[in-house]
Amino acid sequence: MGSDDLSAGDKIQKGFQINYMILRDADTGKVIWQENKDFSAPDVEHEARVPVKILDMRAVSREINFSTIESMENFRLDQKVLFKGRIMEEWFFEMGFVGANTTNTWQSTIEAAPESQMMPAKVLNGNVTIQTSFYDNEILITKSVVRLYYI
């Protein structure tokens, strides 16, 4: 199968890689979690062990560093937070144009749910997955699932 046989999404995915991800306290800028792992691989459920104190933060700043061989007209992602398979929250992020053969850093802020909607870490631990779908406009590039453990 040559590169002409790949769909547009497959072609982008083949040259797409997450280099690292960092979570920071949005108020202080202090790093609370960092992982040098490609969380974009679609065929495996990834795991992330994050400090339990993340649940007490007003907002978290997420930094994704990624590389791409193909250009993207409108790089965006949709994220669903699921508890035991049921959607608790859904977020939409848009970065826009990404040049070919580049490495990029994308930072966005995620605000916590109201305290009245928060569950204790012992209930959430291992039962929360974050499903992230990466797109170029409406073309699905890849979908990844990360299971969260609070330490």
UniProtKB/Swiss-Prot annotation:
Coiled coil: none
GO BP, one annotated term: sensory perception of light stimulus
Keyword annotations of the record: cGMP, Cytoplasm, Nucleus
Keyword flag Repeat: no
Pfam families linked: GMP_PDE_delta (PF05351)
GO annotation, cellular component aspect: cytoplasm; nucleus
Subcellular location: Nucleus; Cytoplasm
SUPFAM superfamilies in UniProt: E set domains (SSF81296)
Subunit structure: Interacts with Pde6.
Membership in a protein family: Belongs to the PDE6D/unc-119 family.
Protein name, as recorded: Probable cGMP 3',5'-cyclic phosphodiesterase subunit delta
